[in-house]
Amino acid sequence: MIVLGIDPALGKLGWAVVAKESTKLHYLASGTIKTHSKDEIHNRLAFINSILEKVILEYQPNIAAIEETFVNTNNVTSLKLGYARGAIMSLIGRYNLDMQEFKPNTVKKTVTGYGHAGKEQILYMIKHLISGTDLITNSDEADAVALAYTCLVAKKY
């Protein structure tokens, strides 16, 4: 089973690919996709999708794990995040991947045991739970790894 974890964002999206063979988890890859706020939104969305499409084609995931969003007090920010999620979900659908959504607190609780854990705690724990993640220093990538981990553990794949 190969999971593509996605921490959705318009400005700086985190992604990670984690595989499970029998009971062992293997970190395969991760990265961030940065877009510039000065670019047109449709170009930013197209750029995100072009990178994620390359990841899907290279690693052939079976399922995508994506973070559920919460409504921000800033309506514009929430709307832009919704655009990014919609574009990502469209890509997931185009490649006929299964998709699971997880609330941020569920991911935090699964990875750290505490539903209100901070970014540093998540980063610390993924390095202990999944070999090969030692070099991850970016919280967006760490969140994506945590999403993939949660999917594999919570859904018992």
Curated annotation (Swiss-Prot):
Binding site for Mg(2+) 2: 67
Cofactor(s) needed for function: Mg(2+)
A GO biological process held by the record: DNA repair
E.C. number: 3.1.21.10
Reactions mediated catalytically: Endonucleolytic cleavage at a junction such as a reciprocal single-stranded crossover between two homologous DNA duplexes (Holliday junction)
Chief location category: cytoplasm
PANTHER family according to UniProt: CROSSOVER JUNCTION ENDODEOXYRIBONUCLEASE RUVC
Stated role: The RuvA-RuvB-RuvC complex processes Holliday junction (HJ) DNA during genetic recombination and DNA repair. Endonuclease that resolves HJ intermediates. Cleaves cruciform DNA by making single-stranded nicks across the HJ at symmetrical positions within the homologous arms, yielding a 5'-phosphate and a 3'-hydroxyl group; requires a central core of homology in the junction. The consensus cleavage sequence is 5'-(A/T)TT(C/G)-3'. Cleavage occurs on the 3'-side of the TT dinucleotide at the point of strand exchange.
Record's protein name: Crossover junction endodeoxyribonuclease RuvC
Species in which this protein is naturally found: Rickettsia prowazekii (strain Madrid E)
